[in-house]
C-alpha cells in the first residue's frame, strides 16, 4: 500500500512524515523484509485503527499486470465495485473513486512471489500517469523500455534479422518511491479542492535517465 505522508508529522519522521510503501506484517516474514531494508512501522488510519507492518521509502518492481476499477462506499453495506469502463454506472450509485492494483515482483522479495501494489487517487495517477501527466510507468516506458527496444532493433539489423521486438515492462526493474527534493526532504504536492485540499507525497520514478538516449 502507498502512504501519502503528512507534513504535520515532521517530528515523528519515518513513514508518517515522508510517505512510502507499507506492507502488512502478515504478508511476509520479518527476516526477509528487514534483510532488504524494510523497517518496522505502524500505520494509524484516520479512523484511529492501526496496522503493524513494514515500511520502505522506495522499492524496485517488475510490473507484470495492472487492473483498475471504480468503488462506491456505502454506510449500510460493503463497497460496490464497477469495471473501469463503467464510470457512469458507478457515479450513479454514489461517490465513485478509482483503485489501481499493480501485480509486481519486488526486488529482494522475489522468493515471496508476486505481490500487489494498491494505489488510489493521486498515488495511482502518479504511478501510472494519465492523459495530461506523465507517471513513473510512463517515464519508464519512454526511457528504459524505449532504449531496450532501440537496442534490440539495432542488434537485429546488424544480424540481418527482423526488427520490431517490444520489451514488456516486466523485463526490467522500475525503481519507484516517495518524491524527494534536491535536499532529500519529502516533496509535498497539493491535491484536492476547496476544503478537501491536502498536501501529500506521491510515488515517482527514481534514478531514471531524462531521455532514452541517456
What are these regions (language model features)?
Residues 1-118, 187-188, 192-210:
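OB-fold ssDNA-binding interfaces and closely related basic DNA-contact patches used
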Residues 96-210:
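Extended serine/threonine-enriched, polar tracts that run as long, contiguous segments within proteins
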Amino acid at each position: 500500500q502507498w502512504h501519502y505522508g503528512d507534513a504535520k508529522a515532521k517530528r515523528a519522521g519515518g513513514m508518517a512524515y515522508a510517505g512510502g510503501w507499507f506492507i502488512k506484517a502478515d504478508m511476509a516474514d520479518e527476516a526477509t523484509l528487514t534483510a532488504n531494508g524494510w523497517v518496522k512501522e505502524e500505520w494509524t488510519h484516520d479512523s484511529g485503527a492501526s496496522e503493524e507492518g513494514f515500511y520502505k521509502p522506495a522499492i524496485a518492481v517488475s510490473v507484470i499486470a495492472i487492473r483498475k476499477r471504480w468503488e462506491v462506499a456505502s454506510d449500510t453495506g460493503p463497497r460496490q465495485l464497477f469495471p473501469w469502463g463503467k464510470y457512469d454506472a458507478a457515479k450513479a450509485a454514489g461517490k465513485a473513486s478509482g483503485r489501481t492494483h499493480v501485480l509486481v515482483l519486488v526486488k529482494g522479495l522475489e522468493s515471496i512471489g508476486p505481490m500487489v501494489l494498491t494505489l488510489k487517487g493521486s498515488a495511482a495517477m502518479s504511478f501510472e500517469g494519465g492523459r495530461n501527466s506523465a507517471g513513473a510507468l510512463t517515464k519508464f516506458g519512454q526511457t528504459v523500455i524505449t532504449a531496450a527496444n532501440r537496442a534490440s532493433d539495432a542488434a537485429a539489423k546488424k544480424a540481418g534479422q527482423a526488427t520490431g521486438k517490444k520489451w514488456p515492462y516486466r523485463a526490467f526493474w522500475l525503481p519507484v518511491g516517495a518524491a524527494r527534493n534536491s535536499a532529500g526532504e519529502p516533496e509535498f504536492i497539493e491535491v484536492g479542492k476547496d476544503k478537501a485540499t491536502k498536501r501529500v507525497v506521491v510515488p515517482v520514478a527514481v534514478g531514471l535517465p531524462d531521455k532514452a538516449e541517456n
